Regions:
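Short, Lys/Arg-enriched N-terminal segments with co-localized hydrophobic residues
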Residues: 1-11
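Juxtamembrane/disordered regions of integral membrane proteins
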Residues: 10-142
Length: 142
């Protein structure tokens, strides 16, 4: 059974939104991880870091995080025309804040510089990725 025009549009929008948001998020985060986060975390908790990183858990996080971002923020904004930056920043602050502030609270060698850097980065990265993914989707498939 062939898809209807509205069904095709739905899947095109969802696909472009997911792929563009994920690509932007992954590319920017990869750059930041290599240039800033890895040296920062190595300086403070190097003995705890896996080398090489475990790819499967990282992939699962990225796939689920982008899916959650689309579900909670980007898709509703696409459908309603609502702005996306503030809502996405809140999601980023909550997600990265949960990790960083909990780690700082319970781990002896967790440094405040790690908390601030990763918290701000996660907030900005999430907001920008959602905004850019939405802009690409609106520009290409409406």
């Amino acid at each position: 059974m062939a898809l209807t025009v509205p069904q095709r549009r739905f899947f095109m929008q969802l696909g472009v939104l997911y792929v563009s948001t994920a690509a932007i998020f992954l590319i920017l985060d990869g750059i930041m991880l290599m240039l800033v986060m890895k040296p920062l975390f190595t300086r403070h908790i190097g003995a705890l870091m896996a080398d090489p990183i475990r790819g499967v858990p990282a992939l699962l996080f990225y796939a689920a995080y982008v899916a959650g971002l689309l579900y909670l923020v980007s898709w509703p904004a696409l459908k309603s025309g609502a702005p996306v930056v503030i809502s996405a920043a809140v999601i980023g602050a909550m997600a990265y804040g949960t990790y960083e502030f909990t780690s700082y609270a319970i781990m002896r060698d967790w440094h405040v510089q790690m908390v601030i850097t990763d918290f701000v980065w996660g907030t900005v990265l999430t907001a920008f990725s959602a905004w850019a993914g939405l802009a690409i989707t609106r520009a290409t498939v409406g």
